[in-house]
From Swiss-Prot:
Belongs to the protein-tyrosine phosphatase family. Non-receptor class myotubularin subfamily. Heterodimer with lipid phosphatase MTM1. Heterodimer with lipid phosphatase MTMR2. The keyword Nuclease does not apply. This is Myotubularin-related protein 12. The keyword Phosphoprotein applies. It is found in: Cytoplasm; Sarcoplasmic reticulum; Cytoplasm, Myofibril, Sarcomere. GO terms for molecular function: phosphatidylinositol-3-phosphate phosphatase activity. Acts as an adapter for the myotubularin-related phosphatases. Regulates phosphatase MTM1 protein stability and possibly its intracellular location. By stabilizing MTM1 protein levels, required for skeletal muscle maintenance but not for myogenesis. The gene is MTMR12. InterPro entries: MTMR12-like_C, MTMR12_PTP, Myotubularin, Myotubularin-like_Pase_dom, PH-like_dom_sf, Prot-tyrosine_phosphatase-like. It comes from Homo sapiens (Human). Keywords: Cytoplasm, Phosphoprotein, Sarcoplasmic reticulum. Residues 449-558 are annotated as: Interaction with MTM1.
Length: 747
């Protein structure tokens, strides 16, 4: 059969030249099987999706040793995706495709997910862009989700090659208008078919009621108020229609500089301290205007800094922290470690893996973000300080750090609904420019910075270190990162709520028609069946038990901070910067005054951070209280499931965390069955139990990169780099050489 073939020309070590020469072109053989093939292969189109161009007799390579095996089929390009329709797709094992995305298939690439396109001309790899004078014999597509697709066009008709290559380059790289995104085509065509999930209780923060609810939940309504001064975006297009500011702040101050220079509330701690953010005022040269701005900021500052009762610490993220350029440069280097064209290239880079990883600085950037979040947590939790985050537009690093702080301090944010609501509040309503940062329109490459991916990587570090504390899994985080590039959801395709609201109208003469109903990414039923969604929920997570009124009354005298941050009892006197359970207001006031003088002392802050960090990690973890990550060198790891999932050689068959989780689920099922028998004996009502995902029950067949890596598809045979096998000597000598004794010591 021609469904699978082998061709030469692999990268790296060259394979021996085959002696057999075929004089029959593949398209001639396909002519005899054309009717059968057309019945087996079907292009599935979404509502509003249109086919633009296609090419037949395309060979899709898979990553394999020195030879390159592949599958023949059709390569098509629509206004939504690039898709490969293989001739033997029906041969896939159903067990391997249970975690299947209903929107994007295994061989589908959304146009927004394409990162770089390369062509191979006479075994030379070149970047493709613009109009081509010569068309390649091989097409390589690097995706933003780190997949690598290789297509051989050697047996495709010349006209089809020109059409498909030109079409893919144009529709993935040419600048677009916002209204020309597939998002609007889909919403228009599927307007009557979009059904929202009734179980989705994510707070969208698009109403005043949502903000009031959040204030009440965090007990922040004593000092802060929700305002509607920007309703209809009359004051500022950058801000949401509703947000929260300090109660003493007059609403006319919000209008004075179009929302700039205003402390906007993010979250309140149980001890009364709060996390706020502020965008910078416009830069002015005129001394008179500068003086007006200074007096304005002095007045604003007094609303949140009223010593000794309230002390504020400012964190200027624009000048004293990471730059967006650093993040982009680091990620550009980092992602190259995983965009592997073939197995030989993988093993070549394996020798220098650690040096390449270190030189990218990506893990160091993650560490710095987590450390900054811990520092702010220490100020709020231990020193009762308000913290004000400063940034030029308060829409990048402010979103990142404020979200991490809330994840560490608020257990509600570690539930799935709480986490989704957090992203809605801090990122979507916070004005993070997803459209520019993801470069969805391809208008300005310099604006593309993976700030949200950095946030998800930081969250993964917390999930990896403290799995029982989170209701969601790393698989949830991985599919969330993939959803950045699926243009049927509005969540990650606008720069601000104003931009979304002003573009929700239908195009056409009928101006009285209803606005478009855009889907939200939080409706996971659009992408996954219920069975697949079980992998997004952590079976080891246990909700915090609710106390009855009698228990709450008995515990009311204790300070809430003690429940989340156990402190060393042997220390008789409190260290500087740590408030204990003193009730004497005078002592607290004096401590407040002393700390306010030391705000700018970096040594003192570093000492406070180290004591706070060490003290927390020396105690047992309360998964429903304060949660701090380890940030030492070895503790910050590579998010293997996201970055290595498409590399067959990186899999551990029947091993990794998925094997451990499978065993734990077996134990949970056994405990649940015993509990059911006990309940039956006592004739009590059986409580609904969470069913263990059947996908995890046979761990021996699973990969460490489950559920993304498919097993028994590729060879995982190591390939020694050229430099390695040459150093070992002649092949005959290797066969005769006896095994050397290696002392492993205590290993």
């Amino acid at each position: 059969m021609l469904g699978k073939g082998v061709v030469g020309g692999g990268g790296g070590t060259k394979a021996p030249k085959p002696s057999f020469v075929s004089y029959v072109r593949p398209e001639e053989i396909h002519t005899n099987e054309k009717e059968v093939t057309e019945k087996e292969v079907t292009l599935h189109l979404l509502p509003g999706e249109q086919l633009l161009c296609e090419a037949s007799t395309v060979l899709k390579y898979v990553q394999e040793d020195s030879c390159q095996h592949g599958v023949y089929g059709r390569l098509v390009c629509t206004d939504f995706k690039i898709a490969f329709l293989g001739d033997d797709e029906s041969a896939l094992d159903n067990d391997e495709t249970q975690f299947k995305n209903k929107v994007i298939g295994e061989n589908d690439i959304t146009l927004h997910c394409v990162d770089q396109i390369y062509g191979v001309f006479d075994e030379k790899k070149k970047t493709l862009f613009g109009q081509l004078k010569k068309y390649p014999e091989k097409l390589i597509i690097h995706c933003k989700d780190l997949r690598v697709f290789q297509f051989c066009l050697r047996y495709t008709k010349e006209e089809e090659v020109k059409r498909i290559v030109s079409g893919i380059i144009h529709h993935t790289q040419a600048p677009k208008l916002l209204k020309r995104l597939f998002l609007f085509s889909y919403a228009t065509a599927a307007q009557n078919n979009t059904v929202t999930d009734p179980k989705n209780h994510t707070v969208m923060f698009d109403t005043l009621k949502d903000w009031c609810w959040e204030l009440e939940r965090t007990k922040g309504n004593m000092k802060y108020k929700a305002v509607s001064v920007n309703e209809g975006y009359k004051v500022c297009e950058r801000l949401p229609a509703y947000f929260v500011v300090p109660t003493p702040l007059p609403e006319e101050n919000v209008q004075r500089f179009q929302g700039h220079g205003i402390p906007i509330w993010c979250w309140s701690c149980h001890n009364g301290s709060a996390l706020l953010k502020m965008s910078a005022l416009p830069k002015e040269q005129d001394d008179g205007i500068l003086q007006i701005q200074k007096s304005f900021l002095d007045g604003i500052y007094k609303t949140i800094h009223r010593p000794p009762y309230e002390i504020v610490k400012t964190e200027d993220l624009s000048s004293n922290f990471l730059s967006l350029q650093e993040i982009q440069t680091a990620y550009s280097k980092f992602k190259q470690l995983f965009l592997i064209d073939n197995s030989t290239e993988f093993w070549d880079t394996d020798i220098k893996w650690f040096s390449l990883l270190e030189s990218s600085s990506w893990l160091d950037i993650i560490r710095r973000c987590l450390k900054k979040a811990i520092e702010i947590t220490e100020c709020m939790e231990a020193q009762n300080m308000n913290v004000l985050l400063l940034e030029e537009n308060a829409s990048d690093l402010c979103c990142l750090i404020s979200s991490l702080v809330q994840l560490m301090m608020d257990p509600h944010c570690r539930t799935r609904i709480g986490f989704q609501s957090l992203i809605q509040k801090e990122w979507v309503m916070g004005g993070h420019c997803f459209l520019d940062r993801c470069n969805h329109l391809r208008q300005n490459d310099k604006e593309e910075v993976p700030v949200f991916l950095l946030f998800l990587d930081c969250v993964w570090q917390l999930v990896h270190q403290h799995p029982p504390a989170f209701e969601f899994t790393e698989t949830y985080l991985t599919v969330l990162s993939d959803s950045l590039y699926i243009p049927i959801f509005s969540t990650f395709f606008f720069n601000s709520p104003h931009q979304k609201d002003t573009n929700m109208g239908r195009e056409g003469q009928d101006t009285q028609s209803k606005p478009l109903n855009l889907l939200t990414v939080w409706d996971w039923s659009v992408q996954f069946e219920p069975k697949a969604q079980t992998l997004l929920k952590n079976p080891l997570y246990v909700e915090k038990p609710k106390l009855d009124k009698g228990q709450r009354k008995g515990m009311r005298f204790k300070h809430q901070r003690q429940l989340s941050l156990p402190l060393t009892q042997s220390k008789s006197s409190p260290k500087r910067g740590f408030f204990r359970e003193e009730t004497d207001h005078l002592i607290k006031n004096l401590l407040g005054k002393r700390i306010s003088k030391l705000i700018n002392s970096s040594d003192e802050l570093q000492d406070n951070f180290r004591e706070f960090y060490d003290s927390w990690h020396s105690k047992s973890t309360d998964y429903h209280g304060l949660l701090l990550p380890h940030i030492e060198g070895p503790e910050i790891k590579v998010w293997a499931q996201r970055y290595l999932r498409w590399i067959p050689e990186a899999q551990i068959l029947g091993g990794g965390q998925v094997a451990t989780l499978s065993k734990l689920l077996e134990m949970m099922e056994e405990v649940q069955s015993l509990q059911e028998k006990i309940d039956e004996r006592h004739h009590s009502q059986q409580a609904p139990q969470a069913e263990a995902p059947c996908l995890l029950r046979n761990s021996a067949r699973l990969s460490s990169l489950f559920p993304f890596a498919l097993l028994q598809r590729h060879s995982s045979k190591p390939v020694l780099p050229t430099s390695g096998w040459k150093a070992l000597g002649d092949e005959d000598d290797l066969a005769k050489r006896e095994d050397e004794f290696v002392d492993l010591g205590d290993v």
